Design a protein with these regions (language model features):
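Core segments of cupin and vicinal oxygen chelate
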Residues: 7, 15-54
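Conserved short hydrophobic patches within well-ordered secondary structure
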Residues: 47-48, 70, 77
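N-terminal beta-strand motif that seeds the catalytic metal site of vicinal oxygen chelate
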Residues: 1-21, 70-73
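Conserved beta-strand in the GNAT
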Residues: 56-58
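Vicinal oxygen chelate
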Residues: 1-6, 17-20, 37, 47, 73-93
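Short glycine/serine/proline-enriched coil/turn segments at secondary-structure junctions
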Residues: 64-66
Length: 93
């Protein structure tokens, strides 16, 4: 089985920020809604949604403040345990 057989779409895109309130307000003006606000450790986190696009922004005060400063892209998958085994087998090749 190939890795692509497990993927179902993008889960979210992670973007760090130095000022979460300004970042949230920016995305709200673009039509996003706040799906969730929480705290992860010491970092404030917000999930912002526009249709099927979800952005996770979190305040870590270490954001690069440069174009393309995306921290991560999360992919939805089915059967993550089986996918993990497939990835491990591919790493051994």
């Amino acid at each position: 089985m190939n890795i692509k057989d497990f993927t179902t779409g993008i889960q979210h895109i992670g973007i760090p920020t130095n000022n979460i309130e300004e970042t949230i307000n920016f995305y709200l003006t673009l039509g996003f809604t706040t799906a969730l606000r929480t705290i992860n450790g010491t970092e404030e986190v917000a999930f912002l949604q526009l249709h099927n696009l979800v952005i996770e922004t979190y305040q870590n005060r270490q954001a690069a403040m440069a174009y393309g400063a995306i921290d991560h892209i999360a992919i939805d998958v089915k059967n993550i345990d089986e996918l993990f085994k497939v990835v491990q087998r591919k790493k051994k090749k």
